[in-house]
Amino acid sequence: MQIKLANPRGFCAGVDRAIEIVNRALEVFGPPIYVRHEVVHNKFVVEDLRARGAIFVEELDQVKDDVIVIFSAHGVSQAVRTEAAGRGLKVFDATCPLVTKVHIEVARYSRDGRECILIGHAGHPEVEGTMGQYDASNGGAIYLVEDEKDVANLQVHNPERLAFVTQTTLSMDDTSRVID
């Protein structure tokens, strides 16, 4: 059997939704619209949005108070949400619903004091946002695992209460290599 991949391929539903949120904000409110992190890893889409008035920033300290900020499909940490609220920023949350589901699970593990493994890539905006959902004050911890070597070096306190989640954009192959 021969499989042909179309090029270019489309975006996932979460990214499509995030792009639509930025487009609608530009239409309704006009530029500038600030977006925390690039809404998608696609230079053509990002440049088009930038040309229409979207301003992509890495951190909230790059924007003035009382402006519109859109959180990208990758999601953000609780600390970023708290900072935005404290500064009176008008936030539109374009976090992918699948990422939000992972955030909710991590927050629940945190509340229950369970240790949690996040399988993902260090430095990726989704991983940073997911790690930032965990509050270790209940006695648990969250660990980032990128590969099999990290698993070999991992020391958990209670393997019976260990949970794991994954970065939503990881391939099944990458994930299964770590889990197996």
Swiss-Prot record:
Pathway: Isoprenoid biosynthesis; dimethylallyl diphosphate biosynthesis; dimethylallyl diphosphate from (2E)-4-hydroxy-3-methylbutenyl diphosphate: step 1/1; Isoprenoid biosynthesis; isopentenyl diphosphate biosynthesis via DXP pathway; isopentenyl diphosphate from 1-deoxy-D-xylulose 5-phosphate: step 6/6. It is an enzyme of class 1 (oxidoreductase). Catalyzes the conversion of 1-hydroxy-2-methyl-2-(E)-butenyl 4-diphosphate (HMBPP) into a mixture of isopentenyl diphosphate (IPP) and dimethylallyl diphosphate (DMAPP). Acts in the terminal step of the DOXP/MEP pathway for isoprenoid precursor biosynthesis. The active site is at E126 (proton donor). Its EC number is 1.17.7.4. One of its GO terms (molecular function) is 4-hydroxy-3-methylbut-2-enyl diphosphate reductase activity. (2E)-4-hydroxy-3-methylbut-2-enyl diphosphate binds at H41, H74, H124, T168. The keyword Oxidoreductase applies. It comes from Pseudomonas fluorescens. CDD domains: lytB_ispH (cd13944). The lineage of its organism: Bacteria, Pseudomonadati, Pseudomonadota, Gammaproteobacteria, Pseudomonadales. Dimethylallyl diphosphate binds at H41, H74, H124. Keywords: 4Fe-4S, Iron, Iron-sulfur, Isoprene biosynthesis, Metal-binding, Oxidoreductase. Binds 1 [4Fe-4S] cluster per subunit. It catalyses: isopentenyl diphosphate + 2 oxidized [2Fe-2S]-[ferredoxin] + H2O = (2E)-4-hydroxy-3-methylbut-2-enyl diphosphate + 2 reduced [2Fe-2S]-[ferredoxin] + 2 H(+); dimethylallyl diphosphate + 2 oxidized [2Fe-2S]-[ferredoxin] + H2O = (2E)-4-hydroxy-3-methylbut-2-enyl diphosphate + 2 reduced [2Fe-2S]-[ferredoxin] + 2 H(+). PANTHER family: 4-HYDROXY-3-METHYLBUT-2-ENYL DIPHOSPHATE REDUCTASE. One of its GO terms (biological process) is isopentenyl diphosphate biosynthetic process, methylerythritol 4-phosphate pathway. This is 4-hydroxy-3-methylbut-2-enyl diphosphate reductase. Signal peptide: none annotated. Isopentenyl diphosphate binds at H41, H74, H124. [4Fe-4S] cluster binds at C12, C96. Its cofactor is [4Fe-4S] cluster. Pfam families: LYTB. Belongs to the IspH family.
